[in-house]
Amino acid sequence: MADTAPQLKRKREQEAEEAETPSTEEKEAGVGNGTSAPVRLPFSGFRVQKVLRESARDKIIFLHGKVNEDSGDTHGEDAVVILEKTPFQVEHVAQLLTGNPELKLQFSNDIYSTYNLFPPRHLSDIKTTVVYPASEKHLQKYMRQDLRLIRETGDDYRSLTLPYLESQSLSIQWVYNILDKKAEADRIVFENPDPSDGFVLIPDLKWNQQQLDDLYLIAICHRRGIRSLRDLTPEHLPLLRNILREGQEAILKRYQVTGDRLRVYLHYLPSYYHLHVHFTALGFEAPGSGVERAHLLAEVIENLECDPKHYQRRTLTFALRTDDPLLQLLQKAQQP
């Protein structure tokens, strides 16, 4: 999917910190809606400083670069650019082999041969996600780091995690831009406008919307002040039920994918602290869908029906990077 700089403002995340692909939290490149008109990157020049992370499996690379060095600022500005090979589109793949495709032989033995095939321009796009200007937090976020599992009690959350989160400058203005139709209004698949129990459903930027195998949408609630799973009580059950039922119905209507082919879940810890729910194709191993982070929405609803304070009391397990100050806070508090 060829996103403009305004659209790219929306990964994440996502993504999940353990994720190898960007998600709806890549929002830092501007505000606005997409266009098919030719566009330019929101900066001039790009001098690679460091490869932050790469994955041959996922065919993705994260680059830190200096930009705008010719604008009078001798030091330039920091930017992160994420390059990702896009999935094949089944309806177009035959075009790669018709006519006289440009090929370079790599290997041949009996009936087996391997080539490098150089596709035409319209079939060789690379998804490019831009984070600009990028802060030190962004550079650390995209750098590969070791992870550790930690168990957080309800008391840990109230005394350590919540104060730590409140001390951080975690802007979610991009979320409000979507909810207020200031950005990406044309990408909204479905909306329940109720200010308390409504939400918008929008494709995650990790999904190019060209095939259903990696379908990925996000439901973002209109109601403000619900940070995460830990805040949920029976008061929020109407909202959660609406997201589950209406989200599945909207996806069935738009994409002909039934609810039993969807994984519908919340992250804990989330990538950003405004309640949102992930809808992914069941066969897609989406970043952050592992047992240490994903909580199925249907089970969240049932837990709240059985115990109104379930998520205030329950011990939750999740992964943190080894350089995350929150990990050190929790580990120190849990030392015997």
Curated annotation (Swiss-Prot):
Keywords: Acetylation, Cytoplasm, Hydrolase, mRNA processing, mRNA splicing, Nucleus, Phosphoprotein. It is found in: Cytoplasm; Nucleus. Substrate binds at residues 174, 184, 204, 206, 267-278. GO terms for biological process: deadenylation-dependent decapping of nuclear-transcribed mRNA; mRNA cis splicing, via spliceosome; mRNA methylguanosine-cap decapping. The active site is at 276 (nucleophile). Residues 1-36 are annotated as: Disordered. InterPro entries: DcpS/DCS2 (IPR008594), Histidine_triad_CS (IPR019808), HIT-like_sf (IPR036265), Scavenger_mRNA_decap_enz_N (IPR011145). One of its GO terms (molecular function) is 5'-(N(7)-methyl 5'-triphosphoguanosine)-[mRNA] diphosphatase activity. Transmembrane segments: none annotated. The keyword NAD does not apply. The C-terminal histidine triad (HIT) motif and the N-terminal domain are required for the decapping activity. The N-terminus is necessary but not sufficient for binding cap structures. PANTHER family: HISTIDINE TRIAD HIT PROTEIN MEMBER, M7GPPPX DIPHOSPHATASE. Belongs to the HIT family. This is m7GpppX diphosphatase. The gene is Dcps.
